[in-house]
A protein has these predicted regions:
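Short, glycine/charge-rich beta-strand/loop segments that flank catalytic centers
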Residues: 1-2, 17
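Structural alpha-beta junctions
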Residues: 122-128, 148
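Conserved beta-strand-loop-alpha-helix junction that forms the acyl-donor binding cleft
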Residues: 2, 131-139
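Amide-forming acyltransferase catalytic core, primarily the GNAT-like/NAT-type
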Residues: 7-111, 118-122, 134-135, 151, ...
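Conserved acetyl-CoA-binding loop of GNAT-fold acetyltransferases
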Residues: 4-11, 140-154
């Protein structure tokens, strides 16, 4: 990949969410675990990813490929909803025989993120689950590569966005 112009650039941190032994309170939010595509799920994920300062943006076609991969690997898109509105979403897949990982998680609030993780652990009967997140500080791992195809245009865009830099 390096000879083709790719460079490892996408860093993630891995955290372990430990489920509380206490059952989740009735919040009126509903957990749904499915490996089926819906436009509503894609639109929510897309909207929440666009709120991040830097991330991999997935097209609708990319999301459909992710769904197909989840179907093959017995994974799920897990959503927490209050009626018709999604409040949190996680892409969840098994790793090994008894472990699961959240490859992506987005939510309206930190509380709904925690509640979604708690519901997932209860539903899958897990004491804990691994969660990949954008790194805040500290240790991270490289999980993706990128290649700039049109360097001149990229540099012009960067210069426009950051005029204070020389």
């Amino acid at each position: 990949y390096g000879r083709s112009g790719y460079a490892p650039v996408f860093r993630y941190a891995e955290e372990t969410f430990i489920a509380s032994g206490t059952p989740t309170a009735d919040t009126g939010l509903t957990l749904e675990m499915s490996a089926e595509y819906t436009e509503k799920r894609y639109e929510y994920l897309d909207r929440k990813l666009r709120e991040r300062p830097c991330c991999i943006q997935h097209t609708e076609e990319d999301f459909q490929v992710i769904i197909a991969d989840l179907q093959l690997g017995q994974g799920f898109v897990c959503t927490l909803s209050n009626g018709e509105e999604i409040t949190a979403l996680a892409i969840t897949y098994p790793i090994g025989k008894a472990n699961w990982r959240i490859g992506e998680i987005v939510s309206d609030t930190p509380a709904t993120k925690t509640l979604l993780l708690q519901h997932i652990c209860q539903s899958l009967n897990l004491p804990s689950i691994r969660v990949l997140t954008p790194p805040a500080t500290g240790e991270s791992q490289l999980l993706g590569m990128a290649r700039i195809i049109n360097a001149k245009t990229m540099l012009q865009l960067y210069a426009t966005a950051h005029p204070e830099l020389e």
